[in-house]
């Protein structure tokens, strides 16, 4: 048996990324109708599913995971992360470099970015009383590695938008956040806005930023969504009744593809541009539920 992790369409071929019985990394290919399915690639290392893989120029970049015995650890196993790629034209595999271990390096869904033939990787290291976060830049051939951004705070990267890297800086107890933009071409950081609570799922389209955030009232966590307009500073928010999660998956000429999850449903649907910026998620045309 195996588990499906991701699926995507590229050059009229359907690709599915799976984890096998031994946690090995597998890629299956099929026609666009799902027929003629076959195993195209397998690797002994595992896919780190905490980080979304990135497709660029026919090459799939991902974070690989391997376990080794560790006599200094009470658990006896150490999970090592590495930066890898698979060329979809011939399924050649390349492992670029080691990038940390699971017990010392914290990474997120959008930690891996590609821009102008360079790979950007965001990670954080936590100790008992401090946190250190960094964004490193690698040449796509792995020949050079440099740090472009680092700070003693918790950082999560969420998007690369036209050469601007959007990220959130949070304090130790997640009670305050600031949403920032870093210029990948010229350097320099701009603070777009600040908000009480923990901000996540940041997505910038044009001058407007969609985001999720959570605050605590002492008894429970309050989940909300917001839209911040960088052109005039206006901030529209809506508070959810219960534990609700919304993320933006993509955009079409007809609207925005969203993932909506609460205690009763786990759904994917298309939301019109007007309803999206008005935060009227109940108007989405949900096509698929898990």
Language model regions located:
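A short beta-strand motif characteristic of beta-propeller blades
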Residues: 1, 36-43, 92-103, 144-150, ...
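N-terminal "mature head" segments of proteins
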Residues: 1-48, 57, 97, 104-105, ...
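Repeated scaffold domains used in trafficking and secretory/extracellular systems
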Residues: 2-10, 46-57, 102-115, 152-163, ...
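Residue position within the beta-strands of beta-propeller blades
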Residues: 15-17, 61-64, 120-123, 167-168, ...
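Structural motif
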Residues: 22-28, 68-85, 123, 127-137, ...
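Short loop/turn segments that connect beta-strands within beta-propeller blades
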Residues: 31-35, 86-91, 139-143, 183-187, ...
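Solenoidal tandem-repeat scaffolds enriched in leucines and small polar residues
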Residues: 79-81, 86, 91-141, 148-151, ...
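Intrinsically disordered, low-complexity segments enriched in Gly and acidic/Ser/Thr residues
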Residues: 152, 156, 170-180, 185-255, ...
């Amino acid at each position: 048996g195996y588990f499906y992790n991701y699926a995507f369409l590229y050059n009229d071929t359907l690709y599915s990324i799976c984890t096998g019985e031994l946690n090995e990394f597998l890629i299956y290919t099929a026609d666009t109708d799902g027929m003629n399915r076959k195993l195209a690639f397998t690797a002994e290392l595992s896919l780190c599913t905490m980080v979304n893989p990135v497709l660029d120029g026919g090459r799939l970049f991902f974070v690989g995971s391997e376990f080794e015995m560790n006599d200094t650890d009470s658990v006896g196993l150490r999970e090592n992360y590495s930066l890898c790629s698979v060329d979809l034209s011939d399924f050649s595999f390349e492992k670029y470099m080691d990038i940390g271990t699971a017990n010392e390096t914290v990474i997120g869904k959008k930690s891996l970015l590609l821009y102008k033939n360079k790979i950007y990787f965001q990670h954080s290291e936590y100790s008992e009383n401090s946190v250190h976060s960094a964004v490193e830049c690698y040449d796509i051939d792995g020949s050079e590695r440099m740090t472009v951004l680092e700070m003693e705070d918790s950082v999560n990267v969420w998007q690369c938008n036209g050469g601007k890297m959007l990220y959130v800086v949070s304090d130790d107890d997640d009670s305050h956040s600031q949403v920032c933009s870093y210029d990948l071409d010229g350097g320099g950081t701009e603070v777009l806005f600040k908000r009480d609570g923990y901000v996540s799922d940041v997505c910038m389209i044009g001058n407007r930023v969609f985001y999720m955030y959570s605050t605590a009232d002492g008894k429970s966590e309050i989940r909300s969504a917001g839209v911040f307009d960088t052109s005039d500073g206006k901030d529209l928010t809506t508070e959810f009744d219960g534990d609700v999660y919304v993320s933006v998956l993509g955009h079409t000429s007809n609207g925005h593809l969203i993932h909506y999850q609460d205690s009763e449903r786990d759904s994917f649907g298309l939301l019109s541009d007007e309803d999206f910026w008005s935060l009227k998620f109940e108007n989405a045309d949900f096509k698929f539920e898990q």
